[in-house]
Curated annotation (Swiss-Prot):
The active site is located at the dimer interface. InterPro entries: PdxA, PdxA_fam. This is 4-hydroxythreonine-4-phosphate dehydrogenase. The gene is pdxA. It comes from Enterobacter sp. (strain 638). It catalyses: 4-(phosphooxy)-L-threonine + NAD(+) = 3-amino-2-oxopropyl phosphate + CO2 + NADH.
Amino acid sequence: MQPQRVVITPGEPAGIGPELVVQLAQRSWPVELVVCADATLLQDRANMLGLPLRLLPYRADQPPVPQQQGTLTLLPVVLRKPATPGVLSTDNGHYVVDTLARACDGCLNGEFAALITGPVHKGVINEAGVPFTGHTEFFEERSHSDNVVMMLATEELRVALATTHLPLKAISDAITPALLREIITILHHDLRTKFGIADPHVLVCGLNPHAGEGGHMGTEEIDTIIPVLNEMRAKGMNLSGPLPADTLFQPKYLDSADAVLAMYHDQGLPVLKYQGFGRAVNITLGLPFIRTSVDHGTALDLAGKGKADVGSFITALNLAIKMIVNTQ
């Protein structure tokens, strides 16, 4: 693989994201790591942890080079207010969004081959006056994508979501034939192009207990899910379901599957996070670029103490590199 540039956003400056990025610099990488962040923030966290860090200037006019141990390439975005580990400040809500916007725009214009995001604090961003539902929705809107799919993955399991951050009472109405067609199409396409799976097999959850029990526990399966699955199978997609979510996550089903499509957030993700928390990666499918993320939050109570585990960030970066290779 020719060296590529990967852009990283550390996320909430008062959280563990900045120090996790500093920990990424403690090894060499086959790609150039361009960090969209405040220089003083990164140096201060490196000093707190007692870790070496040299920040190199980002030069868009120069070809990318593999990142050497102890260094990061800096694309500067200045904090509105100095950050104290563990202490949120609404003054920096706009800073977080600025880093996301610059990183996203760089992916859209071809500067970067992939984007890896650290954890943000949605509450403080909204309190700063910036409407923000999450990374997935932000990148969908900024890239003018018609629709995107949130998927979490470990080495053993991939779970995509038909709906993301919705209250339970809104989910049934949200799962329309048009939505399901689009979600399944994106999932099938990206499993082939970004994951290199020639004929992906997807297990599809029902919405209701026992996948509706033949209409006795809800009719969404009969009215919506089954007709769409039949339609997509006729186009050559390898889909099984709808299957009851309480029995789907068994080896006899998962051993032959490349991904699971859950109907809502808390239907599929508890199983994945129980199995692989700290080793899981959040991936946004359907974007015109590769985006992966850690599977944990800002952990304000750990910030600046050197106790945060960099494992999920490393996994997210390694997966992004694999996806870059698959798309070349």
